[in-house]
């Protein structure tokens, strides 16, 4: 189930970023910061009491016509579109302004739950000034102070009351759910259409558990699939394609509901830094991963080109050394038929469960081949191992001292497990635990 999304929206200079930093920095324990955009403090993930959520800080909405103000307004509207709950931020010192009323009009159209926050209410005497904000039409205003951190608990409690209820997904365990992620214009939608047009067996379009998600089920060779995508990722136009930071949120939502993630690259344009960041999201999720090089038809090539491109991928994506690479062209449909078998393979690997006795035979053979490391005269001793989870395969290795498990030896053990059991396209987790 994807995490709920809160967007903080308001005119300039009402303290949105201050409240954002308060929420993610103090009153909420951070779960993770999204790489590549945290330096702008745009988007973070955290939890409040028993609720995990993602939170977006937007630029101030301004009614001016200057190009940069228009872009800020467009980006804020994208954030509103993504949000499950909107915190409408105002400034208690200024009272209700014409700009607040303009923001309110935008929020009315969103049809989203709105929590009205009146910032800069820094002492109890100022609370009597908040009642004018009822005129905005969003019910009870919540007085808060970004400077002193006052009132944030009540504000987040109210926001959490509007989080979507958890729904059960309507797909059985045998259905493989996969998503396509990548920067704009790498051909994700074209690849979806190539797959669906090729198979001609679309069952229906089913709205997913999130408002934006569109699940497209289809079947091939008695195997059911669901392509998980978001409507926003397929839209064309400057508003969506110019707001790259918010496309990250759509990708994360799709990843969270997937068994397999396809990281789509542009073979014609090559690899850029944003590709690495997006691939990092897939790796960190623990899902099975396939790297897809699209637009291969447009690449001038000889017998060495594919190998050279693959080596370049491995050099840039060292953390995805387990992910198979598929070269294809959505436009010409060349090699698209090779994709589903690879999806099947990595999905199966993602769910492999190894018998404990077989696992320990492999671990002990590995130790015999490469003795465990020592540190300050103490040697790591491995007693036994057991698998505790699948999706991804996760193993607990019981040892005498967890500090002696060097990352390089852990990597060696992972490589031996891959050699023994395959694990194509799936990360492996090893947890060292001291034996009682």
From Swiss-Prot:
Pfam families: KH_dom-like, MMR_HSR1. GTP 2 binds at residues 182-189, 229-233, 294-297. SUPFAM superfamilies: P-loop containing nucleoside triphosphate hydrolases. Keywords: GTP-binding, Nucleotide-binding, Repeat, Ribosome biogenesis. Belongs to the TRAFAC class TrmE-Era-EngA-EngB-Septin-like GTPase superfamily. EngA (Der) GTPase family. GTPase that plays an essential role in the late steps of ribosome biogenesis. This is GTPase Der. It comes from Bacillus cereus (strain G9842).
């Amino acid at each position: 189930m994807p995490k709920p999304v809160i967007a903080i929206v308001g005119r300039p200079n009402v303290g949105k970023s201050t409240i954002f930093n308060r929420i993610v920095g103090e009153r909420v324990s951070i779960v993770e910061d999204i790489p590549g955009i945290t330096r702008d403090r745009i988007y973070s993930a955290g939890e409040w009491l028993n609720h995990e959520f993602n939170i977006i800080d937007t630029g101030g909405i301004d009614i001016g016509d200057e190009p940069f103000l228009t872009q800020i307004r467009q980006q804020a509207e994208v954030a509103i579109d993504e949000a499950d709950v909107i915190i409408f931020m105002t400034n208690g010192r200024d009272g209700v302004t014409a700009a607040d009323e303009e923001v309110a009009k935008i929020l009315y159209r969103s049809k989203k739950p709105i929590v009205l926050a009146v910032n800069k209410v820094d002492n109890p005497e100022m609370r009597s000034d908040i009642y004018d904000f009822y005129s905005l039409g969003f019910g009870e205003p919540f007085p808060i102070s970004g400077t002193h951190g006052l009132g944030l608990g009540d504000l987040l409690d109210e926001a959490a009351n509007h989080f979507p209820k958890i729904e059960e997904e309507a797909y059985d365990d045998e259905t493989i759910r996969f998503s396509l992620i990548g920067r704009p214009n790498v051909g994700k939608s074209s690849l979806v259409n190539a797959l669906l047009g090729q198979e001609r067996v679309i069952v229906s379009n089913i709205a997913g558990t999130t408002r934006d998600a569109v699940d497209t089920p289809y079947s091939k060779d008695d195997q059911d699939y669901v392509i998980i995508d978001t409507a926003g990722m397929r839209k064309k136009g400057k508003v969506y394609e110019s707001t790259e930071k918010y496309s990250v949120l759509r990708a994360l939502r799709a990843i969270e509901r997937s068994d397999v993630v396809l990281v789509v690259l542009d073979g014609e344009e090559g690899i850029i830094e944003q590709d690495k960041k997006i691939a990092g999201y897939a790796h960190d999720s623990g899902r099975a991963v396939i790297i897809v090089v699209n637009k291969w038809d447009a690449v001038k090539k000889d017998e060495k080109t594919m190998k050279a491109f693959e080596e370049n991928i491995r050099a840039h994506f060292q953390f995805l050394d387990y992910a198979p690479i598929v070269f294809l062209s959505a436009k010409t449909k060349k090699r698209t038929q090779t994709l589903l078998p690879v999806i099947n393979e990595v999905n199966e690997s993602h769910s492999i469960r190894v018998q404990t006795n077989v696992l320990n035979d492999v671990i002990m053979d590995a130790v015999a081949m490469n003795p465990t490391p020592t540190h300050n005269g103490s040697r790591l001793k491995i007693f036994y191992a057991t698998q505790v989870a699948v999706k991804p395969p996760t193993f607990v290795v019981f040892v005498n001292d967890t500090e002696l498990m060097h990352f390089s030896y852990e990597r060696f053990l992972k490589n031996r497990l891959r050699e023994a059991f395959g694990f194509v396209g799936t990360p492996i987790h090893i947890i060292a635990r001291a034996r009682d």
